[in-house]
Curated annotation (Swiss-Prot):
<dbReference type="GO" id="GO:0006611">
    <property type="term" value="P:protein export from nucleus"/>
</dbReference>
<dbReference type="GO" id="GO:0005829">
    <property type="term" value="C:cytosol"/>
</dbReference>
<keyword id="KW-0906">Nuclear pore complex</keyword>
<dbReference type="InterPro" id="IPR018222">
    <property type="entry name" value="Nuclear_transport_factor_2_euk"/>
</dbReference>
<dbReference type="InterPro" id="IPR032710">
    <property type="entry name" value="NTF2-like_dom_sf"/>
</dbReference>
<dbReference type="Pfam" id="PF02136">
    <property type="entry name" value="NTF2"/>
</dbReference>
<feature type="modified residue" description="N6-acetyllysine">
    <location>
        <position position="4"/>
    </location>
</feature>
<dbReference type="GO" id="GO:0061608">
    <property type="term" value="F:nuclear import signal receptor activity"/>
</dbReference>
<dbReference type="GO" id="GO:0031267">
    <property type="term" value="F:small GTPase binding"/>
</dbReference>
<keyword id="KW-0539">Nucleus</keyword>
<dbReference type="InterPro" id="IPR002075">
    <property type="entry name" value="NTF2_dom"/>
</dbReference>
<feature type="domain" description="NTF2">
    <location>
        <begin position="10"/>
        <end position="121"/>
    </location>
</feature>
<comment type="function">
    <text>Mediates the import of GDP-bound RAN from the cytoplasm into the nucleus which is essential for the function of RAN in cargo receptor-mediated nucleocytoplasmic transport. Thereby, plays indirectly a more general role in cargo receptor-mediated nucleocytoplasmic transport. Interacts with GDP-bound RAN in the cytosol, recruits it to the nuclear pore complex via its interaction with nucleoporins and promotes its nuclear import.</text>
</comment>
<dbReference type="GO" id="GO:0051028">
    <property type="term" value="P:mRNA transport"/>
</dbReference>
<dbReference type="GO" id="GO:0042802">
    <property type="term" value="F:identical protein binding"/>
</dbReference>
<dbReference type="GO" id="GO:0042307">
    <property type="term" value="P:positive regulation of protein import into nucleus"/>
</dbReference>
<dbReference type="GO" id="GO:0005640">
    <property type="term" value="C:nuclear outer membrane"/>
</dbReference>
Amino acid sequence: MGDKPIWEQIGSSFIQHYYQLFDNDRTQLGAIYIDASCLTWEGQQFQGKAAIVEKLSSLPFQKIQHSITAQDHQPTPDSCIISMVVGQLKADEDPIMGFHQMFLLKNINDAWVCTNDMFRLALHNFG
């Protein structure tokens, strides 16, 4: 991993940590958000750590597992990192579904936090 740019190392580590928390104990996700963080979940907007954790903790499944297909990371001009994830998830006994998620990471007091998070299931309407 040492030959990858630092933003890829940080982004990859964050992604691994995020989905491990999400799949095992969503209530712990508050540690990666701040009060100014924003989440867009399937088009619904949530602002602030408390609202985000409440939303993620109240999702209507008991068990979930994410499988990451690809992840891309870029540095931003203001020293943040933008990360995009494409993968699949399986919730309870539901069929496997694709998803896309984007994170904007910012270093605050020597810790990387998520200031912006956007999630969508990869569902398509052909009409």
